[in-house]
Amino acid sequence: MKKIPLLTKIIFHISNIGLILLYLYPGSIIGWLIYGDFQKQAKITSDFSIISSNHVFAFIILSLLGVFSFTNKKITFLFLYLFFISIALELCHILIPKRSFEYSDLFGNFLGVFLIFILLKLYQFFKSR
């Protein structure tokens, strides 16, 4: 039974490193994979008004992996880390060539983490009743 949390923890850390690499690369690796052009940003899904849907989905997945990987004692730290890294990575775009800071990306990051946070709190609330 301990293999599942270990596996999800490994996947979480690999996904985290992968996301950091995608964020910090000066250009779009996904754009290169899809369009053959590092300059073109990939639009995998349509945005939600002023919120980047790609960022929402990326941080939902990362948050879910984190929730399934860590114990309740570390969940608070996990969410603080996810909120911090979502801000820090987007701010890094100010300094990275061919990248730019965008509020829609930052809001997408926040929304992805926040949705999982709310779902976890609702689950914990109903489980304790």
Residue ranges and their predicted role:
Residues M1-P97, F101-S104, F110, F114-R129:
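Bulky hydrophobic segments
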